[in-house]
């Protein structure tokens, strides 16, 4: 069944790039993917073309201040980044018509970077209030800005030296570091390590104890991320994948917090969306899937790297392609919420 967001086959949508006018394309279609053991079908219900080369991360602004919609409207607000530039795309999409407006900002000058250099950004996260942060994989740093993308709030180095096993694989494989990020309470962040091996890592101020995660460790509606005073975030704890999670996810491309308060993982190599366990304790050693809750992505979605889930439990998937004239953002049919 095609959702109301797709009223027509193709739709031209306006956006502004640093004051210039262009178009992104939206179209509706129905392509599904189903695998034995997966929970139902996922179908592509909308496509967009975001002019970000090698799109690598998505974040949703749950404003209003508690939903993914702009107050008084039925719009969804998203951010998108790529690893090839310092461009940040801000999208507002009308849930009913599919109309979208977008602004693309080159934030290199704000961060004191050279515009022509690759950002190596692989993840983006926001507290939906006044902070947005981008994770640079090979540089092992997180840069934070205000939501208007006009002010730098801080750049933080990731220090993994305190965990010997992590330090070894981090240095040995710089292209298999951070691929996903969630902001938490107390200035802590969860960062997803891509592969060899895949891990979930909790970073925070030096001397802090790891929290793990549950409903009390994630930022609540309207709660601001507590920016640490130290410019170094220390690895406090690692959780490797359980055998079952490793079977479902050959790599780890993105994590996001859904509107149901649950953590979802995207695997590019396995073309799979997975709901992780509800509670992860600090004294546990591994992280696993929640009651085998996983969904295969529809055929044709390759190199999936960005993931958010909107208020209607619809996954949005961003793909990493070099072509700017092809669809790289896909809206999928809803998944069931976690308990």
Regions found by a protein language model. Name each.
Residues 23-339:
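Sequence/structural signature of beta-propeller domains
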Residues 1-13:
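Bacterial N-terminal signal peptides that target proteins for export
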Residues 10-23:
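Bacterial N-terminal signal peptides
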């Amino acid at each position: 069944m095609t959702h109301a967001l797709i009223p027509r086959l193709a739709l031209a949508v306006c956006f502004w790039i640093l004051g210039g006018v262009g178009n992104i394309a939206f179209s509706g279609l129905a392509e599904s993917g189903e695998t034995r053991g997966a929970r139902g079908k996922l179908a592509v219900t909308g496509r967009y073309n975001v002019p970000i080369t090698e799109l690598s991360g998505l974040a949703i602004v749950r404003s209003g201040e508690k939903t993914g919609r702009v107050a008084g409207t039925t719009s969804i607000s998203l951010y998108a980044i790529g690893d090839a530039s310092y461009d940040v795309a801000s999208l507002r999409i009308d849930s009913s018509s599919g109309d979208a407006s977008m602004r693309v900002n080159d934030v290199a000058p704000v961060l004191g970077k050279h515009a022509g250099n690759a950002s190596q950004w692989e993840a983006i996260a926001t507290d939906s209030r006044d902070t947005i942060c981008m994770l640079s994989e090979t540089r092992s740093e997180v840069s934070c800005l205000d939501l208007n993308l006009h002010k730098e709030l801080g750049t933080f180095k990731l220090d993994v030296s305190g965990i010997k096993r992590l330090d070894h694989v981090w240095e040995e494989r710089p292209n298999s570091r951070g691929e996903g990020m969630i902001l938490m309470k107390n200035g802590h962040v969860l960062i997803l390590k891509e592969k060899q091996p895949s891990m979930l890592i909790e970073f925070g101020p030096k001397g802090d104890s790891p929290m793990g995660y549950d409903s009390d460790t994630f930022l609540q509606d309207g709660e601001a991320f507590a920016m640490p005073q130290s410019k170094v975030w220390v690895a406090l704890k690692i959780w490797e994948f359980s055998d079952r999670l490793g079977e479902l996810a050959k790599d780890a491309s993105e994590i996001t917090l859904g509107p149901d308060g649950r953590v979802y993982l995207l695997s590019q190599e396995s073309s799979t969306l997975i709901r992780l366990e509800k509670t992860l304790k600090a004294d546990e050693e591994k992280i696993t899937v929640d009651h085998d809750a996983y969904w295969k992505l529809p055929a044709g979605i390759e190199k999936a790297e960005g993931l958010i889930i909107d208020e209607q439990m619809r996954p949005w998937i961003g793909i990493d392609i070099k072509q700017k004239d092809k669809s790289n953002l896909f809206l999928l049919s809803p998944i069931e919420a976690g308990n």
